[in-house]
Amino acid sequence: MNRFIIADATKCIGCRTCEVACAVSHHENQDCAALSPDEFISRIRVIKDHCWTTAVACHQCEDAPCANVCPVDAISREHGHIFVEQTRCIGCKSCMLACPFGAMEVVSSRKKARAIKCDLCWHRETGPACVEACPTKALQCMDVEKVQRHRLRQQPV
């Protein structure tokens, strides 16, 4: 089942708590104080306009453009999400250019460039850290069935 994170711009206050939670959950010690600026890598991004703020994350597309353009097949669907195999990634940025949502990022380090994106915190039993940390509950982890149920509740009788 295709799961993804959806952001409600009417609830987002732009606090970036989701970014911190994401970076910490993907760091080996999971300790905010232990993160250096080079290690602070969030897979979700808060974007701001003069009238609104919202979070942007991978939409876990069924026919993912990022996976389709990867020249080394480093991007595939695993564990119910689009996954980047870091050992295969060559950091070419093709995936970043192909993503219609701007959810792919290529991060350079001293060793090599690598593509990163939301993996729905597959390593956490409780689900995505950003969803859990959001103080206004602007983020939700959804699947197609949840979206359909939500739409049915919103339709007038």
From Swiss-Prot:
The keyword Iron-sulfur applies. Residues 2-32, 48-80, 80-109, 112-144 form the 4Fe-4S ferredoxin-type domain. [4Fe-4S] cluster 3 binds at residues 58, 61, 66, 99. InterPro entries: 4Fe4S_Fe-S-bd, 4Fe4S_Fe_S_CS, RnfB_subfamily. [4Fe-4S] cluster 4 binds at residues 70, 89, 92, 95. This is Putative electron transport protein YsaA. One of its GO terms (molecular function) is metal ion binding. The keyword Zinc-finger does not apply. Keywords: 4Fe-4S, Electron transport, Iron, Iron-sulfur, Metal-binding, Repeat, Transport. [4Fe-4S] cluster 2 binds at residues 22, 118, 121, 130. It holds the Pfam family Fer4_11. CDD domains: HycB_like (cd10554). [4Fe-4S] cluster 1 binds at residues 12, 15, 18, 134.
